Amino acid sequence: MIASLLPAEDSMTASPLRFILKTFALALLLSAGVAHADKYVLISHAPDSDAWWNTIKNAIKQAGEDYGVQVDYRNPPSGDLADMARLIEQASAAGYDGVIVTIADYNVLQGAIGKVTAKKIPLITINSGTVEQSEKLGAIMHVGQPEHAAGKGAGERAKAAGVKSFLCVNHYATNPASFERCRGFAEVIGVDYKKSTLDSGDDPTTIESKVAAYLRQNPNTNGVLTLGPTSASPTIKALEKSGQAGKLWMATFDLSDDISKGIKSGTVQFAIDQQPYLQGYIPVAVLATMKQMKTTDLKKVMEAVKANPKTQKRFAEYGLTPVYGDRHISSGPGFVTKENISKVEKYAGQYR
């Protein structure tokens, strides 16, 4: 019977993935007769102060409603990765039907994540980390934006605009994956990303002060890249106070009300949109569908998710376009500019 739940050899020949799915198939069978509401958890690396994650919280809530499951959200209040590892370990012992995690730091988290897969709990990784790391951890799939590629995409636009030196404002330097954004950008314009990156911390007043000081001390800087709303809003304030808003080239990752206003005013050239809603919604949809269909055939599961009327309605309403691969799903990058901001600002910070 377990064999009937597995994809045919010719449709999925990668033995590591087949082993993962065989393990989860057994777990599905063992739990098939248990009468309880399916329950999942998403554990992120984000501190409580990072409002960007509200979109993902909204996504898992709506996915739970659409698929009739319960989804919890857990995070380390201060963003401490040791705390995150403990949350993952706790989740492995809490009886969840599936676990969703960010790979904020592979080396720090691999032990804790290993406890999840050791108990044959289905795992999906999102947001931070690479597909290679996701596969090494035994995850079913990764849903996220290739960070280095996104940085390069931003760098190409900056280079075309004449940017030759830049400041990368990193408000979450505790996450090694964050530097991939800066590195990709720097490679395109031909500078050292380490010399161009500012560990700003996440306090708005401190970020504004540090950015202003850097630009005073490095007057030849002709571009600024911020890594999200937490660093973008204070940077916009710093540029406005120094009279450089709209004069010094600026771009950012992600969306918020302040960023939308900045794009419309010309202060921000574009926002790199990783469609975070997808990172929350799709993993819940996939895990719930696997459980409900009692199958680990990813092709069938993804087709079912794509065909789900409630899912289709959500994505159409919010203007979201995931890119489905054979195993992994890319949520971005997309670029929000003055030309298309009106299409997305209605839901910025909520569902975009």
Pin down the residues of each PLM region:
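Sec/Tat signal peptide C-region and signal peptidase I cleavage site
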Residues: 33-37
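Extracytoplasmic "Venus flytrap"
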Residues: 39-67, 72-88, 96, 102-106, ...
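Periplasmic-binding protein-like
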Residues: 42-44, 95-103, 122-126, 167-170, ...
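Short, solvent-exposed amphipathic alpha-helices that sit
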Residues: 51-66, 150-154, 176-193, 210, ...
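Flexible loop/hinge segments that line or gate small-molecule binding clefts
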Residues: 70, 111-149, 256-264, 268-269
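Hydrophobic alpha-helical segments within soluble ligand-binding/sensing domains
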Residues: 84, 141-166, 207-208, 255-259, ...
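Hydrophobic alpha-helical
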Residues: 101-118, 185, 200-262
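Hinge/cleft segment of the Venus flytrap/periplasmic-binding protein
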Residues: 188-189, 286-352
